């Protein structure tokens, strides 16, 4: 099941601005290792889940994984072959607006080589470039 908010104050949202780097959520908060975005882009709930499953399978139920992003922004879409006008379409799915520098996932309790390989596999599932980061003093 894809990630989506349980309840929202407003059903639909405007496009909004996507400029600038991540001001919050750009440092490790929980784990020893993290996956940090280098470019911007939308990340759907399905992509978050695909990356999570990939990391979990590589770790074989070892260590602890934190997901640091959540898809809050609704994306609407009109049905096929419908004329323009008549308002905005219904909500199709939700995305997380990812900015450069945002930490997406964190890991603890596994060796650095295992974490690096798990994040490399998860990076292939994501629509933007990411890098491996480690906490200060962590043995890499």
Curated annotation (Swiss-Prot):
<dbReference type="InterPro" id="IPR000114">
    <property type="entry name" value="Ribosomal_uL16_bact-type"/>
</dbReference>
<keyword id="KW-0687">Ribonucleoprotein</keyword>
<comment type="subunit">
    <text>Part of the 50S ribosomal subunit.</text>
</comment>
<comment type="function">
    <text>Binds 23S rRNA and is also seen to make contacts with the A and possibly P site tRNAs.</text>
</comment>
<keyword id="KW-0699">rRNA-binding</keyword>
<keyword id="KW-0689">Ribosomal protein</keyword>
<keyword id="KW-0820">tRNA-binding</keyword>
<dbReference type="InterPro" id="IPR036920">
    <property type="entry name" value="Ribosomal_uL16_sf"/>
</dbReference>
<dbReference type="GO" id="GO:0003735">
    <property type="term" value="F:structural constituent of ribosome"/>
</dbReference>
<dbReference type="InterPro" id="IPR020798">
    <property type="entry name" value="Ribosomal_uL16_CS"/>
</dbReference>
<dbReference type="GO" id="GO:0006412">
    <property type="term" value="P:translation"/>
</dbReference>
<dbReference type="GO" id="GO:0022625">
    <property type="term" value="C:cytosolic large ribosomal subunit"/>
</dbReference>
<dbReference type="InterPro" id="IPR047873">
    <property type="entry name" value="Ribosomal_uL16"/>
</dbReference>
<dbReference type="GO" id="GO:0000049">
    <property type="term" value="F:tRNA binding"/>
</dbReference>
<dbReference type="InterPro" id="IPR016180">
    <property type="entry name" value="Ribosomal_uL16_dom"/>
</dbReference>
<dbReference type="Pfam" id="PF00252">
    <property type="entry name" value="Ribosomal_L16"/>
</dbReference>
<feature type="region of interest" description="Disordered">
    <location>
        <begin position="1"/>
        <end position="24"/>
    </location>
</feature>
<protein>
    <recommendedName>
        <fullName>Large ribosomal subunit protein uL16</fullName>
    </recommendedName>
</protein>
<keyword id="KW-0694">RNA-binding</keyword>
<dbReference type="GO" id="GO:0019843">
    <property type="term" value="F:rRNA binding"/>
</dbReference>
<comment type="similarity">
    <text>Belongs to the universal ribosomal protein uL16 family.</text>
</comment>
């Amino acid at each position: 099941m894809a990630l989506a908010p349980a309840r929202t104050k407003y059903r639909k949202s405007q496009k909004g601005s996507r400029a600038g780097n991540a001001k919050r959520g750009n440092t490790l908060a929980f784990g020893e290792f993290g996956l940090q975005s280098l470019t911007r882009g939308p990340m759907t709930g399905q992509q978050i889940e695909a990356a999570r499953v990939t990391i979990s399978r590589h770790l074989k139920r070892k260590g602890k994984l934190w997901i640091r992003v959540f898809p809050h922004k609704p994306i609407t879409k009109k049905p096929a072959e419908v004329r323009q006008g008549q308002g905005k379409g219904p909500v199709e799915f939700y995305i997380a607006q990812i900015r450069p520098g945002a930490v997406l996932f964190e890991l603890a309790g596994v060796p650095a080589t295992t974490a690096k390989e798990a994040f490399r596999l998860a990076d292939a599932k994501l629509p933007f470039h990411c890098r491996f980061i480690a906490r200060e003093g962590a043995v890499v």
